[in-house]
Amino acid sequence: MAVDTLSPDWDFDRVDDGSQKIHAEVQLKNYGRFLEEYTSQLRRIEDALDDLIGDVWDFNLDPIALKLLPYEQSSLLELIKTENKVLNKVITVYAALCCEIKKLKYEAETKFYNGLLFYGEGATDSSMVEGDCQIQMGRFVSFLQELSCFVTRCYEVVMNVIHQLAALYISNKIGPKIIETTGVHFQTMYEHLGELLTVLLTLDEIVDNHVTLKDHWTMYKRLLKSVHHNPSKFGIQEEKLKPFEKFLLKLEGQLLDGMIFQACIEQQFDSLNGGISVSKNSTFAEEFAHSIRSIFANVEAKLGEPSEIDQRDKYVGICGLFVLHFQIFRTVDKKFYKSLLDICKKVPAITLTANIIWFPDNFLIHKMPAAAKLLDRKSLQAIKIHRDTFLQQKAQSLNKDVQSYYVFVSSWMMKMESMLSKEQRMDTFAEDLTNRCNVFIQGFLYAYSISTIIKTTMNLYMSMQKPMTKTSVKALCRLIELLKAIEHMFYRRSMVVADSVSHITQHLQHQALSSISVAKKRVISDKKYSEQRLDVLSALVLAENTLNGPSTKQRRLIVSLALSVGTQMKTFKDEELFPLQVVMKKLDLISELRERVQAQCDCCFLYWHRAVFPIYLDDVYENAVDAARLHYMFSALRDCVPAMMHSRHLESHELLLDCYDKEIMDILNEHLLDKLCKEIEKDLRLSVHTHLKLDDRNPFKVGRKDLALFFSLNPIRFFNRFIDIRAYVTHYLDKTFYNLTTVALHDWATYSEMRNLATQRYGLVMTEAHLPSQTLEQGLDVLEIMRNIHIFVSRYLYNLNNQIFIERTSNNKHLNTINIRHIANSIRTHGTGIMNTTVNFTYQFLKKKFYIFSQFMYDEHIKSRLIKDIRFFREIKDQNDHKYPFDRAEKFNRGIRKLGITPEGQSYLDQFRQLISQIGNAMGYIRMIRSGGLHCSSNAIRFVPDLEDIVSFEELVKEEGLAEETLRAARHLDSVLSDHTRNSAEGTEYFKMLVDVFAPEFRRPKNIHLRNFYIIVPPLTLNFVEHSISCKEKLNKKNKLGAAFTDDGFAMGVAYTLKLLDQYQEFDSLHWFQSVREKYIKEIRAVAKQQNVQSTSQDEKLLQTMNLTQKRLEVYLQEFELLYFSLSSARIFFRADKTAAEENQEKKEKEEETKTSNGDGPESTVSADPVVK
């Protein structure tokens, strides 16, 4: 036919025509070779990249979508060209109407169904404020107007289809026929008409089930009434309000009263102006009834069978057509009506769209009450009972169905993989294509069956308001996963499927053309001429021409219409016609394979059943073995997104999407991610603390889940992001461990161990906290001690030699200790500036303590006793070899006790001893701060190679002429290095500072009463020794209250106070410790002598008493010796070898030397207050 359009200049003779064909074949071979080379080149690139791009596509990434559906660029007029002009017109009209119906159906399914269904979604009752309902409806009115126009158009198309069919099927009595229609049945037309009627009744069902829409509509009308009473208040002109109200009434009557379908079938189909008569056209009535029965026969055979494709949807159309037939012709075929209702036993309910379920029996009884009366009530009741039993049986058989489909789908996937991975051989090419075609169709059939089970079961439960068991929910979710698995399978092998589909369609077209060719030859060979035979031949030629091309929807439609004409007069034998019909059905399926699979695997309905999602997640969590199935479920949840984009009641559909996104993520966090985080954390904690035996960890006794499987999952795609379970849990653990470590730094080792365990057990790559580490023992922070120094010095005891503080008493099972490492780590945390601040805080503390010290020394009872003792010592020192008598110290102790005792049994001297110990503890703490600072500095400076010769980085940078930023960085580095070097080399003389700041005040004439201090030291040491022995005895008796083994704070306090008063010489002049030693040695010898005398008499009790006395004396002597050593050590810190006068002399000499070295320059100013500011 195409040759007719060429100009005469391009006519070739037969020789040229043959040469052209040869040349075309050569070019085709060259092109084929080029493509093969190009393919192999691409394959080599893929191999080099080690990433087979084309083999398997990742459903989650989907960077490129491959659309297989061919697009028809020729118009219907161009496609339908035969010599038979009348036939051309008939086929063109019907094809155009069918195309129109398909477009209307597509528009309804994508735009109008979704717009109506999602109305009112995205806003919870709690977030809705008054007036939101009316605002939503206000936005939605324009959508309803569009829907009204759409429905009107549908009415027009239905009317036109009926008129076009009625015009064709007329009896000879009325007038001449356009074409001979005996044996011609345009079944395709009725199927399309059924589809359009299905659209209308679906719209009715959506509106009928939409309570929110009706409620909002009522509220909106009320709002309009209130506006109507006072339009000026709302800034609306009254003349505009009335037409708008009329328009709303029209919309309500047309769309919201459930009359969309009814109004369509109640149209006036007979032309009033004497045109086409429909209701009285008996030929058309018979043809109409025959077509419905034919379609029904095909549908009934396949309904509920494994090979069912779209029979349910056609059944809805048949019901619509039957009601339309009854409405037009007012005749009922009782037998057929009963057959239609009998289907309800096979199919109790049909899902029209999303969550809209349709009951055929209700529809037929409601739309045809006259026919319903002919049936007995029992049979109608039986249908309803059967629906209930169907649901019960389905609930029981769901698990079996899941297992069966698991096996079916798994074996189908294996077939797909093996078949598509095989290289195609040329000798079995046709057989391979047939196999592939069958496997593809089988996959689609499984998808259809699974989809039907899920939708019917879920929607029936919802419609009948019956609760679903958890078992049923889990089974249905498994089916959803299987459904998505089928879609994923097709998608993964998109490249091979795309390649196969084009070959299969060509193969099927070839088979169809062969069948048509045989029939065409049969018609041509028959020499009898008739117009009917000419129509048949023209129809077959049209079918042939149309099949020679891409398998587009329009071409397949034309072939279907052409064969409706071409199969009359027995042009095909029975054994030829059935295979042709099968081939055409396969061609339909394969040509739209991707679209049909997508439609069946579309889980948009899940939005209305998202209440099952928490139960599903709980199941996934409990059965972590199948964790990977989460991908399928999220793929199903993602299917709701395109539909939501058609919502029109909110400002933007993005609001609805955000709301849905948040809801799903909240459920995921609550039912899976947070539970997983807590479980992993708990497992790590219990594993690290197994030594505590917190609970039974035996996996044979206590069931354990392998949660590690969750971390091997690829990130799950949802909306425009990926949910990475591994990253989520890792972040949670990192955050938790970091926060808990900052609260309790001493636990850093435990959390570090937990991090390592998380890596080993779950493969989680954790981040190091990089917090300053501490030693494993618990250590108080410098800042904490500094702020509470008054509590610290009273609760902790100082050990001079080990330079350690030990807690005095604690309710815990262990005592806290503080050593140089703790202090060094704290200084590293807070910086060296904390040292100076600590000294200042200690200075403030000492000021308060020395005030109490001064008050005690000034007390009349104390002062008078001390003056007496000084006078007494001066008088007897020559007689007593310049030694302070031990008896005098004991007498002083006893005398003080007479002054009074506290409720705790302490004398004033005991309290004074505690004061001195606290002062000494404060000084011990200052010493530890200095040592900790040196420790910290030496740790920081240890990587500097030579402390004596540190290069200047600033100079080096200047020499190289580097940038200003680098110079600044070098200057900072030099500064840091010099600070650390100075700190590590010398440190700061804090003791000297604290002596210098208090000494002048202590030595002033107004504080003359403090000069008596040296004489109170002997009784004070005696008090201390008695207290110390008492504490150590408690330690031996395991009495933790008041037990102690060290308290060098006392020695430090005495040494510091003597230094401040410059009384080392005065104290030494007492020769106190020498006096003590002589006294105890003398007593020990006396006891030993007595023991020798008594050993002859056999009095054992007396001997035991003497032994105990000797031990006691030795213990006392040992304690005094220890105190003497501690005091001697402490005195070294305060330079006990020099008096205040000698120190001043030394200071002056240094100053003179400095002046001499500086020349006679201006005197440098010295700070009056040596305490660090």
Curated annotation (Swiss-Prot):
Q: Which GO terms describe its biological process?
A: cognition; endolysosomal toll-like receptor signaling pathway; endosomal transport; endosome organization; neuromuscular process; protein transport; regulation of Arp2/3 complex-mediated actin nucleation; regulation of protein complex stability
* Protein source organism: Mus musculus (Mouse)
Top-level taxonomic group: Eukaryota
Keywords from UniProt, A to Z, are: Acetylation, Coiled coil, Endosome, Phosphoprotein, Protein transport, Transport
Subunit comment for this entry?
Answer: Component of the WASH core complex also described as WASH regulatory complex (SHRC) composed of WASH (WASHC1, WASH2P or WASH3P), WASHC2 (WASHC2A or WASHC2C), WASHC3, WASHC4 and WASHC5. The WASH core complex associates via WASHC2 with the F-actin-capping protein dimer (formed by CAPZA1, CAPZA2 or CAPZA3 and CAPZB) in a transient or substoichiometric manner which was initially described as WASH complex.
Designated name of the protein: WASH complex subunit 4
Q: Which cysteines are joined by disulfide bonds?
A: none
InterPro entries assigned: WASH-4_N, WASH-7_C, WASH-7_central, WASH7
Per the record, the similarity remark reads:
Belongs to the SWIP family.
Q: What is its main location?
A: other
| Residues modified as Phosphoserine | S7
Basic and acidic residues composition-biased segments: 1141-1155
Could you confirm whether the keyword Protein transport appears in this record? yes
